[in-house]
């Protein structure tokens, strides 16, 4: 298939683009220029790879989940272990790349948004490493849900700003972070945490996260002598999924499955299934599928997992849905919790609640596949951060 996105204006079909105020246009153009140069600079690539290897701990293993495979009785199940990265999730693949870019551009300060706190921790971590000042915006509700991550960020030297506006979640944190960037743009780089925002952010994040899919491809071929038949990843904004899917987009024999949060059910108001239930609109500088009402007001997204309750989804996912290259599904809070417990009991691996959505969908998919077929799950993060809230949730139930 002929797939080459984004185009030079930063569009993925009708999606993406740069819907930003004049005050930011210069900065996003400057960022695009700096990014292009860095990508062609061997020294930059060498430095990035050095940190990915010695600091992040790449490459991460592709693990054959024998017990899960036996339990499902279908396809061989493999886990791409992004939970084993330094800081416990895929987020650092992107933050290390963007922080090196910030240093290259002569910026002294970094601003970022965070939902579950994973991107905030990964950003604060690389800022500590590279001596950058760090400000993190986090919704008030998420601050409550993720107290430990807030403390971690502060330990790492970051200033955490709690955002009470709106629903006090990720969307509101992004609003405030963008506002902050507008007024500090001369010395500050904004590290977007997902494949969202105005061009070139969705491309930058996708490219830095593509290390996931590139490694998976190589590792799976070494183990099985072919490509996997199916690849599954969870989707909030969509960066772990985009990093996993992008290297496989041209391999049409590989089925790609994105898994959103159905929350209390897609028939209710309490979900974050943007690609299942959303419509096209503009948010945070980019055109994409959104959860919005008939007046175009953004609706609140809900998920048991703080990292999936974003009311939009990356522009590239929006395109991949429309052209049918990726098949998007949703998993409820209860299904994700069940998968969380199952993987923990069967493999001794505690997945993040976000990743548990991908595991839950894989549990439905694997039994429908043949025994000589392979299914890879992107295990995007570890579940230590969620154990406390899961304990609470299970006690209430």
From Swiss-Prot:
Residues that bear N6-(pyridoxal phosphate)lysine: 91
Top-level taxon of the source organism: Bacteria
Keywords: Amino-acid biosynthesis, Aromatic amino acid biosynthesis, Lyase, Pyridoxal phosphate, Tryptophan biosynthesis
Cofactor(s) this protein requires: pyridoxal 5'-phosphate
MF terms (GO), sorted A to Z: tryptophan synthase activity
InterPro entries: Trp_synth_b_CS, Trp_synth_beta, Trp_synth_beta/beta-like, TrpB-like_PALP, TrpB-like_PALP_sf
Enzyme Commission code: 4.2.1.20
GO cellular component, one term: cytoplasm
UniProt pathway: Amino-acid biosynthesis; L-tryptophan biosynthesis; L-tryptophan from chorismate: step 5/5
Catalytic activity, as annotated: (1S,2R)-1-C-(indol-3-yl)glycerol 3-phosphate + L-serine = D-glyceraldehyde 3-phosphate + L-tryptophan + H2O
The keyword Amino-acid biosynthesis is assigned to this record: yes
Cysteine pairings via disulfide bonds: none
Quaternary context: Tetramer of two alpha and two beta chains.
Family: Belongs to the TrpB family.
Function: The beta subunit is responsible for the synthesis of L-tryptophan from indole and L-serine.
Identification of the protein by name: Tryptophan synthase beta chain
Organism: Bacillus cereus (strain AH187)
